[in-house]
Each structure stands twice: as C-alpha cells, then as structure tokens.
A protein has these predicted regions:
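PLP-dependent amino-acid enzyme catalytic core
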Residues: 1-277
Length: 277
C-alpha cells in the first residue's frame, strides 16, 4: 500500500483527537477543572495537523476556549492567522524544529472548508491561487471566524533554545525544540477569555533532538547523536526511550535516495519488487 506518512493522511490525523479528550480527562481527575469548563490548548505545528485534530475535538463537543498555533521561524501560519494573507513566497529556514519547517500547511485547506461552512467554491479558489501565485487572502468575515477559534505566536531559534532552558530550570522537565516553540508562545500569549486551564501539547521526545537540547542546556554537544543522548541522560537524570537508544545498534533498513524527477519510476520499480515477494 502506498501512503503518505505525514498528517495530510487523515488516518494519522483523526487518532490525534484523543489527545485532547485525554488531557481534559486528566485535568478533571486532578481537580483542576470541573466538567464543562473550557480549556485552552497550545499546539506546536507546521502542517496544521495536530491542531486540526483539536478543532475536530471541539466540534465533537470538547469545551475548547482557544486553539493556539505555535510556529517556529517559518512563521507562515502565524502571519496568516494574524493578517488573513497566506503567502509562501518567503525564505525557507532550516531550524532545530525540523518537523515545523513547512511553507505550505496541507491541513489548512480542511480548516478553511469547515470554518467557511463548507464553501467548496471559495476553498477551491483559494487553493488555486496558492498553486498559481503562492499566496491567497481570505475574506475579512472568514478571518474573524478563524481568529475566534485560533490564536497564534512563533519563536525564533534563540527563543526556542531559551525556552528549553527555562522549562528545565523551572520544572526539571526537558522539552524538545518543537515543544519549546509552544512553551515560548504560551508565555507570550495572554490566556484566552473563559479558559479555566491551559494545556501545552508536548509533541516529541527531546531524545529525538539530543544535540539541540544539549546545546540549549549549556552542555557539551557531541557530534554523534547517540553520544549526545548519553550526555543528556547523565545531565538531566532522565532515560532515553529504548526505541531511540536501540537504533545505535540496529542495521540501516532503507538506503535508497532518489531525486524528485526519479520518484515515479522508483515507485513503479519498488511496487514490482513488492509484488514478487
């Protein structure tokens, strides 16, 4: 079966709805909220997938006060949610939060569909503008509707590193660079009106990005990722997930690299190989 691995695949996106209900249930058990209280969620995102799952949770009835988008230096989403103009015609930055290094957020189309009350003609027109010119602007009324549901903010590289250090110093909790974008944004954005609690979604293990975390914490930064994991373990008295640590001794399974113009022929040849196995 050929399938997309990222959140444009609704099969990966829909299960993420569970995060929001699970977080709400934890707050209830902790006595932090009462049933029916509204909660604000801050979500580090690039492809608008995880936070769209939060919007689905809201539509399912979860009391959500606001969904706050946290971007990295590639802040096309933050700009869009502020101005109503989506413009991918800008520099692309390679950051220490690579999963958010995106200039075209695939799932935004799904959000536009829902918040425009299913106006397929409008959404199709916007997507055509994006394909042809790299930008589009939503009507003012639609922007107001979007802003009533979504807040936003972004963090520079230095702010991401500072957030990792700040969270460790304040809480003894190590966060990865993506989560650090959200940590910074939550500190900068005022709580949503009516929110009884605020939740930051921690989106990845810091051990997936051990060198960036070591650097942010002022530790020795080995060139080797696995050595950096060990430095991080010793300094923070935490343990790397076994699934990551064991990769050091695992054989490399996939070594093929192909250019974009070779993709179609590669997929065809791979499919033929699979069909004979």
């Amino acid at each position: 079966m050929l399938s997309s691995a990222n959140s444009i695949n609704v099969g990966r996106l829909v299960p993420q709805v569970v995060y929001y209900f699970a977080a709400y249930a934890q707050l209830l058990r902790a006595g932090a909220i009462e049933a029916g209280d509204a909660v604000e969620f801050c979500v580090p995102t690039g492809n608008f997938g995880d936070i769209l799952a939060g919007y689905y949770a809201k539509r399912m009835g979860l009391p959500v006060a606001k969904l706050v988008v946290a971007s990295d230096k590639n802040n096309v989403l933050a700009d869009f949610l502020t101005t109503g103009v989506y413009d991918r015609n800008r520099p692309f930055f390679t950051t220490i939060s690579p999963s958010m290094d995106i200039l075209i957020s695939s799932n935004l189309e799904r959000m536009l569909y829902f918040l425009s009350d299913g106006d397929c003609e409008l959404v199709a027109g916007l997507m055509e503008q994006l394909a042809q010119t790299g930008r589009y602007e939503v009507p003012a009324e639609l922007l107001a509707t979007i802003q009533s549901v979504f807040g936003c903010g972004w963090a520079s590289e230095d702010e991401v590193r500072a957030a990792i250090k700040s969270c460790w110093d304040a809480n003894g909790y190590v966060i990865d660079p993506h989560t650090a974008c959200g940590y910074h944004v939550f500190e900068q954005v005022a709580p949503a009106v009516g929110a009884k609690a605020r939740v930051l979604l921690s989106t990845a293990s810091p051990y997936k990005f051990p060198r960036a975390c070591c650097e942010a914490l002022g530790l020795n930064v080995p060139e080797d990722d696995f050595e950096a994991m060990r430095v991080l373990e010793q300094a923070t008295n935490t343990v790397a997930p076994a699934q990551l640590a064991e990769l050091e001794s695992k054989p490399v399974r996939f070594e093929d690299v192909c250019d974009v113009d070779e993709m179609a022929s590669y997929v065809e040849s791979a499919a033929k190989r699979m069909s004979t196995n």
